[in-house]
């Protein structure tokens, strides 16, 4: 995983994308056991993960995927709690963002505060991010303790266990396939991103 990100970080952008055949074992892998009931396109990440920061905020791969998804299909993002510090707290905070429908407002400041400025170190710092994003303090506190948020936390934890997640960032399709970044063409960033997106689209249509 580290190697792929070091290479991607050194790539000069190129606009000469090349179509590539998508095959099992290369751009994606079929899970040994499929998991029913998961979102059709599911990304796992952690605000504590430097590679997730690059994936989201530097290369904007998730944004490219979202733009290219067919109508009616959405990208769902789950936070993992196995990366510290505050892994479990950040997962619950992400559940609050999901419940309030403000994931896009929260994602950037949390990533920046943890990975770049290192100004987020406590639960109070996380709470302040929500308040700065326009959430009333009492609304945040109520959501934090709500049944909906607790259910979303459990949902994220269950998906991690059911899919036997090994690391982040990771993207799954239909509970059957995981995208394999190590098998992507990394001759340029544009080629890599295009192939990543095309792999997702291919897997959505795959029976």
Placement of each model-derived feature along the sequence:
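Acidic/histidine-rich, surface-exposed loop or edge segments in extracytoplasmic proteins
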Residues: 42-47, 91, 179-184
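Short, flexible active-site loop motifs that bind/organize anionic cofactors or intermediates
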Residues: 42, 116, 130, 139
């Amino acid at each position: 995983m580290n190697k792929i990100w070091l290479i991607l970080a050194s790539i000069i952008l190129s606009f000469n994308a090349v179509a590539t055949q998508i095959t099992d074992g290369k751009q994606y892998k079929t899970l040994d056991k499929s998991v029913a009931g998961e979102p059709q396109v599911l990304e796992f990440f952690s605000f504590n993960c430097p590679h997730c920061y690059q994936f989201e905020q530097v290369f904007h791969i998730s944004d490219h995927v979202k733009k290219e998804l067919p109508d009616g299909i959405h990208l769902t993002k789950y936070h993992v709690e196995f990366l510290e510090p505050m892994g479990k707290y950040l997962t619950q905070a992400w559940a609050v963002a999901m419940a309030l429908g403000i994931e896009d407002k929260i994602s950037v400041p949390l990533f920046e505060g943890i990975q770049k400025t290192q100004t987020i170190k406590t639960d109070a710092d996380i709470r302040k991010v929500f308040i700065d994003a326009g959430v009333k303090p009492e609304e945040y506190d109520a959501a934090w303790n709500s049944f909906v948020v607790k259910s979303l936390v459990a949902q994220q934890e269950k998906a991690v266990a059911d899919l036997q997640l090994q690391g982040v960032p990771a993207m799954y399709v239909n509970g059957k396939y995981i995208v394999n970044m190590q098998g992507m063409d990394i001759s340029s960033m544009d080629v890599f991103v295009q192939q990543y997106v095309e792999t997702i689209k291919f897997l959505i249509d795959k029976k």
